[in-house]
Curated annotation (Swiss-Prot):
Its cofactor is Mn(2+). This is Adenine deaminase. The lineage of its organism: Bacteria, Bacillati, Chloroflexota, Dehalococcoidia, Dehalococcoidales. It catalyses: adenine + H2O + H(+) = hypoxanthine + NH4(+). Keywords: Hydrolase, Manganese. Belongs to the metallo-dependent hydrolases superfamily. Adenine deaminase family. It comes from the Bacteria. GO terms for biological process: adenine catabolic process. It comes from Dehalococcoides mccartyi (strain ATCC BAA-2100 / JCM 16839 / KCTC 5957 / BAV1). Pfam families: Adenine_deam_C, Amidohydro_1.
């Protein structure tokens, strides 16, 4: 250790040759927002110096290309990619993401700590630094049934692991406001650590109360005024641009000379198709530049700002002593990535990963679909109420609206009405064979025929399905049982497409390219049936999340998120 440090110092002083020297680089300096024409010397995976260095075991002349720090994704759920962690690394490293922060609460809600162990073990040899925010909401709420639990003692134990930065997004904001002991115990266990927030629409005294608990950030802002208030009260604002959650254009005016240090870019949830076609956090940087943000500032929000918020020593900058995580590109505005270096090693070039990751998937994670036997009669929506609460989808957002509509029942049974775009939605508990089934109506999917189903359903990941009739709903759900989890489409009683996600019912075991092809095929088929949503299965996956306003459906029934209570249904 001391020998390496001594050698690093000698390289920095120019007394010993470097492992790698990058000549004629235009280095993005994230500390002073300047671009320096200079050279960079690397030794033992770290940057030894920036300046007049020319002698190295390997010398690459960048000929005036830009050299950026490796990008950092400040808040993402890797499970939303539907990829095994090895394939996920292939997708994001080639796009310049060399570090990320995740809380793994998706796989944890299915498998508990075993799911966390799988991701951390599988990522150990990857050229990608994964930092864990311990999941705070497993289960997310008392309004749904999860597959596992992580209590305050588990939180305390996990916080002692390497690469653990703090406590993950506290989605149960009502639990904070109402002082629920189990929620407060987790916050107390994480005292002194970074604590991420999740507080959609919270303002005024409730916002003050939430922040007073020690919660430092929020990524759920969808309106500029909301983001301004939260920033003014001391929060870091994570500006989100994911596959379903697109808030960048609305929130970008928040970033000014006075406020930019309190802002960072995140994706939250991004599909493998988007990762392959558009990129990861690099896509957010590119879009921010297109929307008018200075390129260097955009890079700061995806590197040094994130590193400083999470106290990631050695990440986020090209400077002496920092990890040699670097990106080479020719055009700063387009961020067309030519080369990616991880700890001084070339790991991706021209969008292609140069490493061959090995998957390490425990067999115990491959059997997670446990639905109590059911039939089509169990999917029937019955009511005697004159008005029915209906979930309305908002395209491009994960928030929903509550509609209270007069629906005519036939002998007490409510059916879908495709002319009015009123479809059936059901949620089936899939962890403990409890037999719980939630029933409701939803508007915004636009299907004219068939049904879609998914075992990806934030955050407890029960089975959620939307369709035009009970027979197709049944067929699509049964397909999920057959393939051990995933997504499925059924039309006229037949399965027409499905994608198997057998790892916890969330992740594929196949290569990135195959998963993307399968997803494109099923999405195309769904579009032909009338669905106008750009990401129908991503949207579907959020319809059972009872911590995002306004109306949701879980296996226990309809949830009014404003009151944080189940809505009684009279049958």
């Amino acid at each position: 250790m001391q020998t390496n440090l001594s050698q690093l110092i000698k390289v920095a002083r120019g007394e010993t040759e470097a492992d790698l020297v990058l000549l004629n680089a235009r280095v993005i300096n994230v500390f002073n927002a300047e671009i320096e024409q200079t050279n960079v010397a690397v030794f033992d995976g770290k940057i030894a110096g920036v300046g007049d260095y020319r002698h190295g075991k390997e010398v690459i002349d960048l000929k005036g290309a830009y050299l950026l720090p490796g990008l950092i994704n400040g808040h993402t759920h890797v499970e939303s990619s539907m990829l095994d962690i090895a394939q996920y690394a292939r997708a994001v490293v080639s796009n310049g993401t060399l570090a990320l922060i995740t809380d793994l609460h998706e796989i944890s809600n299915v498998c508990g700590k075993e799911g966390i162990d799988y991701v951390l073990d599988a990522s150990a040899d990857l050229p990608l630094s994964i930092f864990l925010q311990v999941p705070s909401c497993v289960p997310a709420t008392h309004l749904e049934t999860a597959g596992a639990e992580i209590n305050s003692q588990d939180v305390a134990d996990l916080l002692r692991l390497p690469n653990v930065t703090g406590l993950g997004e506290m989605m149960n904001f009502p639990g904070v406001l109402f002082g629920v002991p189990s929620v407060l115990d987790k916050i107390i266990a994480a005292t002194g650590k970074v604590m991420d927030g999740h507080a959609p629409g919270l303002s005024g005294k409730d916002l003050n109360a939430y922040i007073s608990a020690g919660i430092h950030s929020d990524h759920e802002c969808i309106h500029l005024a909301e983001a301004k208030e939260k920033l003014a009260r001391g929060m870091y604002i994570m500006i989100r641009e994911g596959s379903s959650e697109k808030n960048l254009a609305e929130l970008l005016p928040l970033v000014t000379d006075k406020t930019y240090k309190r802002c960072l870019f995140v994706v939250d949830d991004r599909s493998c198709a988007d990762l392959k076609s558009d990129g990861d956090i690099d896509a957010v940087v590119r879009k921010a530049i297109r929307l008018g943000l200075d390129p260097v500032r955009a890079i700061q929000l995806a590197s040094i700002n994130t590193a400083e918020y999470f106290h990631l020593q050695g990440h986020g900058a090209i400077a002496p002593g920092y990890l040699a995580n670097m990106i080479v590109c020719q055009n700063l505005e387009q961020l067309d990535i030519d080369m990616v270096f991880h700890k001084g090693k070339l790991v991706a070039e021209k969008g292609q990963a140069l490493f061959k990751p090995q998957s390490r998937i425990p067999k115990s994670l491959l059997n997670s679909i446990h639905i109590k036997p059911f039939n089509t009669e169990d999917l029937v929506l019955k009511t005697i109420q004159p008005q029915i609460p209906v979930i309305e989808v908002i395209p491009g957002q994960i928030v929903t609206r509550r509609l209270d509509l007069k629906i005519t029942a036939e002998n007490g049974v409510i059916k879908a009405n495709t002319e009015l775009d009123l479809l059936k939605i059901v949620v089936l508990e899939r962890h403990h064979q409890s037999g719980n089934i939630g029933h409701g109506l939803i508007r915004g999917f636009g299907l004219k025929k068939g049904a879609i189903a998914s075992s990806v359903a934030h955050d407890s990941h029960n089975v959620v399905a939307v369709g035009t009739n009970d027979a197709d709903l049944y067929t699509a759900i049964k397909e999920l049982e057959r393939i051990n989890g995933g997504i499925a489409l059924a039309v006229d009683g037949q399965v027409t497409a499905s994608v198997s996600l057998p790892v916890a019912g969330l992740l594929s075991t196949k290569p990135l390219e195959e998963v993307v092809t399968e997803l494109e095929e099923i999405n195309n088929q769904v579009a032909k049936l009338g669905c106008k949503l750009s990401a129908p299965f991503a949207t579907l996956s959020f319809m059972a999340l009872p911590v995002i306003p306004e109306l949701r459906l879980t296996d226990l029934g309809l949830v009014d998120v404003k009151t944080f209570k189940l809505i009684p249904q009279e049958t």
